[in-house]
Amino acid sequence: MATQAHSLSYAGCNFLRQRLVLSTLSGRPVKIRKIRARDDNPGLRDFEASFIRLLDKITNGSRIEINQTGTTLYYQPGLLYGGSVEHDCSVLRGIGYYLESLLCLAPFMKHPLKIVLRGVTNDQVDPSVDVLKATALPLLKQFGIDGESFELKIVRRGMPPGGGGEVVFSCPVRKVLKPIQLTDPGKIKRIRGMAYSVRVSPQMANRIVDSARSILNKFIPDIYIYTDHMKGVNSGKSPGFGLSLVAETTSGTFLSAELASNPQGQGAAVLPEDLGRNCARLLLEEIYRGGCVDSTNQSLALLLMTLGQQDVSKVLLGPLSPYTIEFLRHLKSFFQIMFKIETKPCGEELKGGDKVLMTCVGIGFSNLSKTLK
């Protein structure tokens, strides 16, 4: 295994997931110092510790050292093993926090991954499971990750602060990834959505749908928003409601937006009408930003392009989010790869905001964990 000399060193608690995921894929150890060192409550938070435990479950032979105060972490990655795993996520963050990283790692396991995650399915901070199902899964399919065993299923919903949700994610393994050419975002052809309500009146979901449609109907007739009212044990432990919207384009691109109500006992109560209208506006804003991948999944697309065969991949993105910009810096540190970035100013055709064309040659990453049959 690599020695401490090869390890990368970082300071601070930001982008912890990016660093650990890229460390696992590249096999380079990472040392992170000064994790909230000056905070009143220093060190790793519960949800970060839970994430490290999850990495430990899906890998074989990882070495994790955390000091007494939790302010320094040394991670020496093992091999991605996969198999059947269960994990109780921290209710401080959504399941999306954990799932985003699993989507990056799952195709490179030794055995196909089948994981049950329990916790908060929809919150105001992380991408909800609904949005990841509607946008990230089709993106992975573009890279050739597909099959009957590729699914993400919501068994129970759970809202903060109590949680109680449950999702099942299964993903096949791939030896190599296909290069992609996603340069034509296409035009919006349909909008689909999911209005959910748990432990409140089912009427809430209908009120959300009506208000969201009142805005979106001005632009396109093909809108269908499903209502999902889970009852009993399937509704988790806390009341709440929310909406996720996904716009599909003629070239198979998915752009998403979502909103959830305030957690029980925190902040003012949100009117379902306001939530529906605001979510519809967020979707219009995402469509304005445009690109072939929505802002939630920019970093996932760039990672899979990096790990592809030694061939050119291109993707047209909207404005890069700060998270994606930092991710590009990390890709350079871990994989020594740099993207060619061309700005494409919006023309006269009312195509929305300025776009960025990202081009790279894959490093020809071969799944070392997967044994040859």
UniProtKB/Swiss-Prot annotation:
- What SUPFAM superfamilies does the entry give? EPT/RTPC-like
- Coiled-coil positions: none
UniProt keyword terms in alphabetical order: Nucleus, Ribosome biogenesis
Upper classification of the organism = Eukaryota, Metazoa, Chordata, Craniata, Vertebrata
Q: Which GO terms describe its biological process?
A: endonucleolytic cleavage in 5'-ETS of tricistronic rRNA transcript (SSU-rRNA, 5.8S rRNA, LSU-rRNA); endonucleolytic cleavage in ITS1 to separate SSU-rRNA from 5.8S rRNA and LSU-rRNA from tricistronic rRNA transcript (SSU-rRNA, 5.8S rRNA, LSU-rRNA); endonucleolytic cleavage of tricistronic rRNA transcript (SSU-rRNA, 5.8S rRNA, LSU-rRNA); ribosomal small subunit biogenesis
Q: Which InterPro entries match?
A: RNA3'-term_phos_cycl_insert, RNA3'_phos_cyclase_dom, RNA3'_phos_cyclase_dom_sf, RNA3'_term_phos_cyc, RNA3'_term_phos_cyc_type_2, RNA3'_term_phos_cycl-like_CS, RNA3'P_cycl/enolpyr_Trfase_a/b, RPTC_insert
List the protein's name.
RNA 3'-terminal phosphate cyclase-like protein
Q: Where in the cell is it found?
A: Nucleus, Nucleolus
Q: What is its main location?
A: nucleus
Any single Pfam family the record assigns to this protein? RTC
Return the similarity comment.
Answer: Belongs to the RNA 3'-terminal cyclase family. Type 2 subfamily.
GO MF terms here are: RNA endonuclease activity
The keyword Nucleus belongs to this UniProt entry's keyword annotation: yes
Indicate whether Nucleus appears among the record's keywords. yes
Gene Ontology CC annotation, any one: nucleoplasm
Record the organism.
Homo sapiens (Human)
Subunit composition and interactions: Part of the small subunit (SSU) processome, composed of more than 70 proteins and the RNA chaperone small nucleolar RNA (snoRNA) U3. Interacts with BMS1.
Role: As part of the small subunit (SSU) processome, it plays a role in 40S-ribosomal-subunit biogenesis in the early pre-rRNA processing steps at sites A0, A1 and A2 that are required for proper maturation of the 18S RNA. Activates BMS1 by promoting GDP/GTP exchange. Does not have cyclase activity.
